[in-house]
Amino acid sequence: MEQVYNKLVRDKIPEIIESNNEIPITRILNDKEYKEELEKKLYEEYQEVIGANGMDRIEELADMLEVMKALASLENKTLDDVIKVAREKEIKRGAFNKRIYLKKVLKK
């Protein structure tokens, strides 16, 4: 039986498939395709995060983080670089801890 995926997978997935006595049919993406597939994967992981809770949500957040690492590497940056920028933004603009919901802004 054949199952079609047509999506970016983690590096060890072909080995895991082979260990299950199945044959993965793969190809290596070019730079443009890789970027596009990472963007699709980020959206896919986002949707999974929204639909999960508890430890499942943590697992999905970890998947999302892995995609973010790969996207950062396309910009010749690391996850540490992303975290540094996030900290700088937190210092300047704050975090989301206070649960502030901005309804509107009135002119004085």
Residue ranges of model-derived segments:
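Flexible "arm" and connector segments at domain edges
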Residues: 1-108
